[in-house]
C-alpha cells in the first residue's frame, strides 16, 4: 500500500486561493498567480494532452508526483465549485475539461450522490457520500501500491491531516494577504523536512509527517 500524500501549492503567506471566490473566479482574486509556475512545464502540458513545455527541475518534481500517484481525493468545490443538488450546479461535470490532468481515479467528497463521470485520459470521477473515511478506502483500493493524493480544498485537507504520511508544499513567491488558508484547523502534526528544491518560480518542500 502506498502513502497518503498532500501535494499542493500555496502563497508565501499560507493561502491556496485568494479572497472572493466565485464560479467565474474559483481561485479567488489573485489565486491563479499561485499556480503560474506549473503551466509551462512539459509534464503539465503532457497531462493535458498538449506538446511542448519546459523540462526544468520544477518539471521533474511535477512528473515525479504524477507518476507515483494512483488515485486522488478532492472536495466538491474543487471539482466543480458548486454545492447542493447536482441539477442546480452549472458545472455538474466539473471544470476540468474533457481530458483532466489526473489520469487516475478521482474520488469526490460530496453530500449528493450521483453516477461516476468518465473522462478522457484515464480519469474517472467517483462521488462518495460516505465521508472522508469512505473516500479514502475507495481511493486506496483503486491506487494499489501507488500513493493516494489529497488534492484539496483546505477543508478536505483538514479532514485528512491526521492521516497524511507525507506533504509536498510548493511555495509560490508571492503574498495574497487574504483568502483561503491551507492550515487553520486544530490539527498540529509534527513535520520533518526531507527535501528542498528551489527555483526562481517556486520552492518545493517535502515533509515527512512524524507519527
Task: Kindly give the residue locations of the regions a language model identified.
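Enzymes that bind and transform nitrogen-containing heteroaromatic metabolites
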Residues: 1-211
Amino acid at each position: 500500500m502506498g502513502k497518503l500524500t498532500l501535494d499542493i501549492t500555496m502563497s508565501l503567506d499560507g493561502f491556496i486561493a485568494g479572497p472572493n471566490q466565485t464560479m467565474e473566479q474559483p481561485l479567488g482574486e489573485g489565486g491563479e498567480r499561485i499556480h503560474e509556475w506549473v503551466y509551462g512545464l512539459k509534464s503539465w502540458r503532457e497531462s493535458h494532452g498538449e506538446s511542448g513545455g519546459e523540462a526544468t527541475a520544477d518539471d521533474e518534481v511535477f512528473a515525479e508526483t504524477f507518476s507515483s500517484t494512483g488515485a486522488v481525493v478532492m472536495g466538491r468545490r474543487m471539482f466543480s465549485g458548486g454545492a447542493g443538488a447536482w441539477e442546480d450546479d452549472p458545472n455538474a461535470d466539473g471544470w476540468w475539461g474533457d481530458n483532466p490532468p489526473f489520469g487516475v481515479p478521482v474520488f469526490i467528497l460530496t453530500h449528493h450522490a450521483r453516477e461516476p463521470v468518465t473522462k478522457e485520459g484515464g480519469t474517472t470521477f467517483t462521488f462518495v457520500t460516505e465521508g472522508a473515511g469512505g473516500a479514502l478506502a475507495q481511493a486506496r483500493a483503486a491506487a494499489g501500491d501507488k500513493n493516494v493524493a489529497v488534492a484539496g480544498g483546505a477543508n478536505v485537507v483538514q479532514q485528512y491531516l491526521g492521516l497524511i504520511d507525507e506533504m509536498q508544499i510548493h511555495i509560490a513567491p508571492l503574498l495574497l494577504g487574504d483568502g483561503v488558508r491551507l492550515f487553520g484547523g486544530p490539527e498540529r502534526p509534527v513535520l520533518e523536512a526531507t527535501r528542498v528544491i528551489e527555483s526562481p518560480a517556486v520552492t518545493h518542500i517535502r515533509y515527512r509527517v512524524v507519527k
